[in-house]
Amino acid sequence: MTDDLLEEYAPEIPEGYVRMNWFQGFGRQIGPLYERVNADKSYTRAFLVGEPHTNGMKNCHGGMLMAFADMALGHAITLHANRYWVTVRMVTDFVDAAAIGDWVEGSGKIAGCDDDIYTVTGRIWSAERTIMTATGIFKALGVRPPKRQV
């Protein structure tokens, strides 16, 4: 990756979203990422498509969308079971493109669970446009420690 990722990137974000505190490793490379807890206790994760996220056509790269879908869908397990998880399989359908400046959102819902294997379905969208649909198979691992209050 390039040093331009170190530059401060502070887009204007929609109301209710907070920046996720993933400042190291992979999250740093693809972020910044945002999260909102909705009134019904569901969640939405999001990012603003910037130049580092794009392909040669200046649209959001499919790999970025797949990585984001992984984090958006897998978070359903974190909320449901308070456990770490790994992705076993992810099936995605690309429906539309996201351009630089698009606010991309995503969420997932648990469709089923057998032992420690979860099936989660989800959608990635921008405004009213569906960008991607996905179904993920995830394996739940150990219990997550409580979040530290800062």
Task: Describe the residue ranges of each PLM region.
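Terminal targeting signals and extreme-terminal segments of soluble enzymes
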Residues: 1-150
